Amino acid sequence: MASASGAMAKHEQILVLDPPSDLKFKGPFTDVVTTNLKLQNPSDRKVCFKVKTTAPRRYCVRPNSGIIDPGSIVTVSVMLQPFDYDPNEKSKHKFMVQTIFAPPNISDMEAVWKEAKPDELMDSKLRCVFEMPNENDKLNDMEPSKAVPLNASKQDGPLPKPHSVSLNDTETRKLMEECKRLQGEMMKLSEENRHLRDEGLRLRKVAHSDKPGSTSAVSFRDNVTSPLPSLLVVIAAIFIGFFLGKFIL
């Protein structure tokens, strides 16, 4: 009995499958989703294969059968048809890769499978896994597209600098000249203000000694005349502050 059961035992799968056990399909599933299955033949013999599924209406497989030469690889495209995805429903779909060593002078593939003995067949089973992209995956997919304008802005930013430097040099010279002129005006106005203040004191002394009644008139005239240079000094200071602020910025 042991020998009989050993005779009926299947051979281990000769092909190397990639992926070996799970076919992963990544959503969204509003369109056809394709995943690839690589079949590698590491032996020195030709191997016949065919791909079966428990849900033939839901998938399109190309190629679904064929012959793999020794040391060769065949890529099988498994295309999942669009459907309404329910995250709470686990996929029960499965695939099976069935293989058999090709007989010499093979001419009819269908006849090979029909005449194959059970102990000559080798098979591997794979389950289907449906995955929806999470928020992190969406952000990672968006990052490359965002990086382009960010890098572009960084590259575009420094481009005008050589031109702006030459303008700043010319503008700096003008500002320095304007500052010097305004400083000279301020010194001149300060000198005039000091002179007028001294003159006002002298006039008040003269008026006080000669005509006491005219003190208020002189004082009034001094109060009217004196703020004018002070106002000019304030205006000049504002201009200097404006130009210096522009220069610093």
UniProtKB/Swiss-Prot annotation:
- Cytoplasmic topological domain ranges are 2-228
- Disordered: annotated segments: 135-166
The GO molecular function terms of this record are: FFAT motif binding; microtubule binding; protein heterodimerization activity; protein homodimerization activity
Q: Where are the transmembrane segments?
A: 229-249
In-chain residues carrying the UniProt-annotated modification Phosphothreonine: 170
Q: Where does this polypeptide localize?
A: Endoplasmic reticulum membrane; Cell membrane; Cell junction, Tight junction; Nucleus membrane
One GO cellular component term of this record is: microtubule cytoskeleton
Q: Which Gene Ontology BP terms does the record give?
A: ceramide transport; cholesterol transport; COPII-coated vesicle budding; endoplasmic reticulum-plasma membrane tethering; negative regulation by host of viral genome replication; neuron projection development; phospholipid transport; positive regulation by host of viral genome replication
Q: Which residues form a coiled coil?
A: 168-207
Annotated site, Involved in binding the phosphorylated serine of the phospho-FFAT motif, chain positions:
50
Q: Which residues carry this modification: Phosphoserine?
A: 166, 214, 216, 219
Q: How does the record say this protein sits in the membrane?
A: Single-pass type IV membrane protein
Segments of this protein annotated with the region phosphorylated FFAT motif binding: 50-53
Q: Which Pfam families match?
A: Motile_Sperm
What residue stretches are annotated with the MSP domain? 14-131
Listed InterPro entries? Ig-like_fold, MSP_dom, PapD-like_sf, VAP
Keywords from UniProt, A to Z, are: Acetylation, Cell junction, Cell membrane, Coiled coil, Disulfide bond, Endoplasmic reticulum, Membrane, Nucleus, Phosphoprotein, Tight junction, Transmembrane, Transmembrane helix
Which residues are reported to carry the modification N-acetylalanine? 2
Answer whether the UniProt record assigns the keyword Membrane to this protein: yes
Query: Tissue-wise, where is it found?
Result: Ubiquitous.
Q: What is known of its domains?
A: The MSP domain binds the FFAT motif of many proteins.
Give the similarity note.
Belongs to the VAMP-associated protein (VAP) (TC 9.B.17) family.
Q: What does this protein do?
A: Endoplasmic reticulum (ER)-anchored protein that mediates the formation of contact sites between the ER and endosomes via interaction with FFAT motif-containing proteins such as STARD3 or WDR44. STARD3-VAPA interaction enables cholesterol transfer from the ER to endosomes. Via interaction with WDR44 participates in neosynthesized protein export. In addition, recruited to the plasma membrane through OSBPL3 binding. The OSBPL3-VAPA complex stimulates RRAS signaling which in turn attenuates integrin beta-1 (ITGB1) activation at the cell surface. With OSBPL3, may regulate ER morphology.
Quaternary organization: Homodimer; disulfide-linked. Heterodimer with VAPB. Interacts with VAMP1, VAMP2, STX1A, BET1, SEC22C and with the C-terminal domain of OCLN. Interacts (via MSP domain) with OSBPL1A (via FFAT motif). Interacts (via MSP domain) with ZFYVE27; may retain ZFYVE27 in the endoplasmic reticulum and regulate its function in cell projections formation. Interacts with OSBP. Interacts (via C-terminus) with RSAD2/viperin (via C-terminus). Interacts with IFITM3. Interacts with OSBPL3 (phosphorylated form). Interacts with KIF5A in a ZFYVE27-dependent manner.
Name recorded for this polypeptide: Vesicle-associated membrane protein-associated protein A
Native organism is: Mus musculus (Mouse)
Classification lineage: Eukaryota, Metazoa, Chordata, Craniata, Vertebrata
Q: Which gene encodes it?
A: Vapa
